[in-house]
């Protein structure tokens, strides 16, 4: 798996409503990147940390603003690791939390 895809970075902002309750507002920002498979070593390390890794997205570092979630299709995932490769690219490792 190494192909271009469209995906959304999920930006969250917290606001208080009229009753004083804090609510989270999500904004979905469309981006394009290259989807890659996870190496076996990365898969096992993530599993040991309680994560179910799903893949890696390589995208422009200029378009990434420390978002914690990514949406691919209808599924939202946590970004559990970010790697800047020293150029203008960033690798976003994403997956699901296992258990509680």
Give residue spans per PLM region:
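Extended boundary segments
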Residues: 1-34
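Short, conserved turn/kink motifs that form compact alpha/beta structural patches or helix kinks used as
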Residues: 21-100
């Amino acid at each position: 798996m190494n192909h271009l895809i469209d995906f959304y970075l999920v930006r969250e902002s917290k606001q208080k409503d009229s009753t004083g309750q804090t609510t989270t507002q999500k904004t979905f920002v469309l981006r394009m990147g290259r989807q890659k498979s996870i190496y076996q070593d990365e898969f096992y390390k993530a599993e040991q940390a309680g994560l179910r890794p799903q893949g890696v997205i390589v995208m422009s570092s200029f378009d990434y603003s420390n978002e914690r979630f990514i949406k691919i299709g209808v599924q939202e995932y946590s970004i559990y690791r970010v790697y800047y490769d020293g150029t203008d690219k960033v690798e976003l490792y994403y997956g699901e939390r296992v258990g509680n």
